[in-house]
Curated annotation (Swiss-Prot):
ATP binds at residues 126-181. Mg(2+) 2 binds at E260, N262. Keywords: ATP-binding, Cell shape, Cell wall biogenesis/degradation, Cytoplasm, Ligase, Magnesium, Manganese, Metal-binding, Nucleotide-binding, Peptidoglycan synthesis. Its EC number is 6.3.2.4. Mg(2+) 1 binds at D248, E260. Its cofactor is Mg(2+); Mn(2+). Pathway: Cell wall biogenesis; peptidoglycan biosynthesis. GO terms for biological process: cell wall organization; peptidoglycan biosynthetic process; regulation of cell shape. Binds 2 magnesium or manganese ions per subunit. This is D-alanine--D-alanine ligase A. Residues 99-293 form the ATP-grasp domain. The lineage of its organism: Bacteria, Bacillati, Bacillota, Clostridia, Eubacteriales.
Length: 301
């Protein structure tokens, strides 16, 4: 089978996408697949590069990759692809919409308000959230543009930083607790990972540089483990996720807060998903086989 690994892209996460793509190419079984690297530098070249593919393994992150646009293009052209569909990708990329759905499903998520570029800032609502708080772009990932603001004097600088990456940003309640992630494969939870970082939070540096964060199987009580898995399953169904995904959470006391849902989790050497799969008993090559197998079943045109 011919597998095109679509990588690069046009978002701020291009560098990470290239790392993901490279690691996927290195670990795909060469005896099973004819592997074609598909580097993307502009939106327009994608159509020519993917039209003859038997299968597209999407290694893109951020806008025009993780937001449903590439998925829609592939579906239109009849090319099967890895991961979730158009709707799930679009919803999970929009943190504001995601949080509204989480709220509607009775799943805890930090309180938040939205700010829009070139509109007045609602300082009173921000004050009601309280400090410390988190300022982040509404779309995008890899923790790019995120700042933890401890006091009011730091707020404007953090807002300006987030607006460099998006026209819409979130001001979010800061939840101090244990950072965990639940990777899902075919709708089933893999071992839950606990994240301990030397940084202030699980930021870009902690995610992609060796030795900055320690991720290991979480030592949770049976009750908490069950709660996390139930929440993850509910997220999977509510957002119509397919094949694989990752739900990032924080545990505070006995309460679990969903921070965000990733439809195309990072697949670099240091990424969480391969580590969780390894703890389950799947090496990276086997994980890639499983993603391809499940995706083809899911997207039969």
């Amino acid at each position: 089978m011919q597998i095109g690994v679509v990588m690069g892209g046009v978002s701020t996460e291009k560098e990470i996408s290239n790392l993901t793509g490279k690691y996927i190419i290195e670990n795909l079984d060469k005896s099973k697949y004819e592997i074609l690297p598909i580097p993307i530098n502009t939106k327009f070249e994608l159509i020519d590069k993917i039209k003859c593919l038997e299968f597209a393994f999407i290694a893109l992150h951020g806008n025009f990759g993780e937001d449903g646009k590439v998925q829609a293009l592939l579906e239109t052209m009849g090319v099967p692809y890895s991961g979730s569909g158009v709707l799930a990708s679009s919803l999970c990329m929009d943190k504001n919409m995601s949080k509204k759905i989480l709220q509607g499903e009775g799943i805890k998520t930090p309180r938040w308000i939205m700010l829009y570029k070139n509109e007045d800032i609602d300082f009173e609502s921000i004050k009601n959230i309280g400090y410390p708080l988190v300022v982040k772009p509404n779309s995008g990932g890899s923790s790019i543009g995120i700042t933890i603001v401890k006091k009011e004097q730091e707020l404007i600088k953090a807002i300006e930083e987030a607006f460099k990456f998006d026209e819409e940003i979130l001001i979010e309640e800061y939840i101090k607790g244990e950072e965990i992630t639940c990777c899902m494969l075919d709708g089933k939870p893999l071992p839950i990972l606990s994240i301990k970082t030397k940084e202030e939070f699980f930021n870009y540096k902690a995610k992609y540089f060796e030795g900055v964060a320690e991720e290991k199987v979480a030592d949770l009580s049976l009750e908490l483990k069950d709660q996390v898995e139930k929440i993850s399953n509910k997220c999977w169904k509510s957002f119509k996720l397919k094949v694989y995904g990752r739900i990032d959470m924080i545990i505070k006391g006995n309460e679990v807060y969903v921070i965000e849902i990733n439809t195309l989790p990072g697949m670099t050497k240091y990424s969480l998903f391969p580590k969780s799969a390894k703890a389950y008993g799947l090496n990276f090559s086997e994980l890639l086989d499983k993603i391809i197998e499940l995706s083809i079943k899911e997207y039969e045109f």
